[in-house]
Amino acid sequence: MKANKPAPNHVIFKKISRDKSVTIYLGKRDYIDHVERVEPVDGVVLVDPELVKGKRVYVSLTCAFRYGQEDIDVMGLSFRRDLYFSQVQVFPPVGASGATTRLQESLIKKLGANTYPFLLTFPDYLPCSVMLQPAPQDVGKSCGVDFEIKAFATHSTDVEEDKIPKKSSVRLLIRKVQHAPRDMGPQPRAEASWQFFMSDKPLRLAVSLSKEIYYHGEPIPVTVAVTNSTEKTVKKIKVLVEQVTNVVLYSSDYYIKTVAAEEAQEKVPPNSSLTKTLTLVPLLANNRERRGIALDGKIKHEDTNLASSTIIKEGIDKTVMGILVSYQIKVKLTVSGLLGELTSSEVATEVPFRLMHPQPEDPDTAKESFQDENFVFEEFARQNLKDAGEYKEEKTDQEAAMDE
């Protein structure tokens, strides 16, 4: 008789307040924006009834946009803008209890009677988590969009930031991410031609990709066809992957960064042609110390990548999206001049494409892992980044003891 295959372990992320009054549990750190809908943040809060006696416990979701270093104050101008804030009271429960998710039901069963569920939703107009990579020598916070979940206990009905006791609160970063749509667009292709002085016929360039969407880490084959009907020599063919980042909220900053490049060894003499495929792989690993590269929002420095292409729901105002990211292939040809190297000219054309994550597993399949309550609890890691100043918390007694 064939043994049943055990259900896979499901990692549950948890974080506890310094005074041990509040512990928050989340089933994941990344929440998927499907364009038409966004996965809600469903989790639970475990409270110590003695420590929260007479208090209220809240959970909040904040989306914030930062532009540059917040420690630089110019005429009172704030370099942070909250794009969205939502808050729910979880203890004591208010109103009729809503439906719980399968994850919440399993956690309540495992953690006991002092566990309270919460559900926070994203509106459809919010940007995804993204940040511009600071240079190694930069200090302070860099430009980016991030999402923060906070759970806290307080006596006060006024839950302003400066009135929340830090020892009774926990803060953690999550990410809102997009994955590639299931339907591909048309195969990207571009053609261009140039007429040169003293040449009757043009130089033609055709560039094509095998598909519209590539996944992070996937090789991108670029087919280049050069038809040189001129009297000049095409001395160099260079293919680039360019990341185009547009900061649209506070300004109209526009960054174009090359994140991968390849060069053909062949030249194309007058009245000849060449077709060649060059393969490029844009990776963060090759761009880690370059300032201004857009990244998917960071939770831990080792688990991020180049920012995914932005997909905007129809009808949404682009200016509230914070940072827009797109990608293009650029092919540059260097053409000889009358005086050789001194008068060489460059011509180029671009082909847009999308760089994204593949679709995750079927949600119904993922839910099966909850049925046996096979949870593995993992402490929610604090940011290990130079730009983590705002999220840096005082150490717990246990952490302090470990440092001694």
UniProtKB/Swiss-Prot annotation:
Domain of life: Eukaryota
GO cellular component, one term: cytosol
Modified residues (N-acetylmethionine): 1
Location of Phosphothreonine modifications: 230
Keyword annotations of the record: Acetylation, Cell projection, Membrane, Phosphoprotein
Effect noted on mutating residue 197 to A: Abrogates tetramerization, reduces dimerization, does not affect binding to microtubules and to phosphorylated light-activated rhodopsin
One GO MF term attached to the UniProt entry: phosphoprotein binding
Transmembrane residue ranges: none
Record-annotated disulphide pairs: none
A Gene Ontology biological process term: signal transduction
Tissue: Detected in retina, in rod photoreceptor cells (at protein level).
Variant or mutagenesis effect after changing residue 175 to E: Strongly increases affinity for RHO by breaking the interaction with D-296. Abolishes oligomerization. No effect on affinity for RHO
Subunit structure: Monomer. Homodimer. Homotetramer. Self-association is cooperative. Isoform A and isoform B interact with RHO (via phosphorylated C-terminus).
Record-stated family: Belongs to the arrestin family.
Domains: entry comment: The C-terminus of isoform A interferes with binding to non-phosphorylated RHO. Interaction with phosphorylated RHO triggers displacement of the C-terminus and leads to a conformation change that mediates high-affinity RHO binding. Isoform B is C-terminally truncated and is therefore already in the optimal conformation for RHO binding.
PANTHER family the record matches: ARRESTIN (PTHR11792), S-ARRESTIN (PTHR11792:SF15)
Biological role stated in the UniProt entry: Binds to photoactivated, phosphorylated RHO and terminates RHO signaling via G-proteins by competing with G-proteins for the same binding site on RHO. May play a role in preventing light-dependent degeneration of retinal photoreceptor cells.
Name this polypeptide is given: S-arrestin
Species, as recorded: Bos taurus
